[in-house]
């Protein structure tokens, strides 16, 4: 391992849950306004993950007051306080950009079901 990889490994977060496109996540983001800071939640569907390693980012989409809002987050950013997986979605694509065109019930994602005891 070279020096660049070693520096990247120490800066990567360790407590990131495993999530995939189609999952509904709640991202707790630190917002700094002047000398005050607070945590703001952004909950929506993961529509894609890009790159890998320290450069990895993901995009979350939600509908707010009838308007689609997408926000991209660097996965290992210090401004992300926590990522919580709400539901697991069952999709067959890595990028869910087709959700941008869908409205209402058509934009729902099927929930993944787990069988316990197998």
Swiss-Prot record:
<dbReference type="GO" id="GO:0022625">
    <property type="term" value="C:cytosolic large ribosomal subunit"/>
</dbReference>
<dbReference type="InterPro" id="IPR018257">
    <property type="entry name" value="Ribosomal_bL19_CS"/>
</dbReference>
<dbReference type="InterPro" id="IPR038657">
    <property type="entry name" value="Ribosomal_bL19_sf"/>
</dbReference>
<comment type="function">
    <text>This protein is located at the 30S-50S ribosomal subunit interface and may play a role in the structure and function of the aminoacyl-tRNA binding site.</text>
</comment>
<keyword id="KW-0687">Ribonucleoprotein</keyword>
<comment type="similarity">
    <text>Belongs to the bacterial ribosomal protein bL19 family.</text>
</comment>
<protein>
    <recommendedName>
        <fullName>Large ribosomal subunit protein bL19</fullName>
    </recommendedName>
</protein>
<dbReference type="InterPro" id="IPR001857">
    <property type="entry name" value="Ribosomal_bL19"/>
</dbReference>
<dbReference type="InterPro" id="IPR008991">
    <property type="entry name" value="Translation_prot_SH3-like_sf"/>
</dbReference>
<dbReference type="GO" id="GO:0003735">
    <property type="term" value="F:structural constituent of ribosome"/>
</dbReference>
<dbReference type="Pfam" id="PF01245">
    <property type="entry name" value="Ribosomal_L19"/>
</dbReference>
<keyword id="KW-0689">Ribosomal protein</keyword>
<dbReference type="GO" id="GO:0006412">
    <property type="term" value="P:translation"/>
</dbReference>
């Amino acid at each position: 391992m070279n020096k660049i990889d070693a520096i990247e490994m120490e800066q990567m977060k360790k407590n990131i849950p495993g999530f995939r496109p189609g999952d509904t996540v709640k991202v707790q983001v630190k917002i700094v306004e002047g000398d005050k800071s607070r945590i703001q939640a952004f909950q929506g569907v993961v529509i894609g993950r890009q790159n890998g390693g320290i450069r990895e980012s993901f995009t979350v989409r939600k509908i707010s007051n009838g308007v689609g809002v997408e926000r991209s987050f660097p996965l290992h950013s210090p401004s992300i306080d926590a990522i919580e997986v709400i539901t697991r979605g069952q999709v067959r694509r890595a990028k869910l950009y087709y959700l941008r065109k869908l409205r209402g019930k058509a934009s729902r994602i099927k929930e993944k079901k787990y069988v316990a005891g197998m």
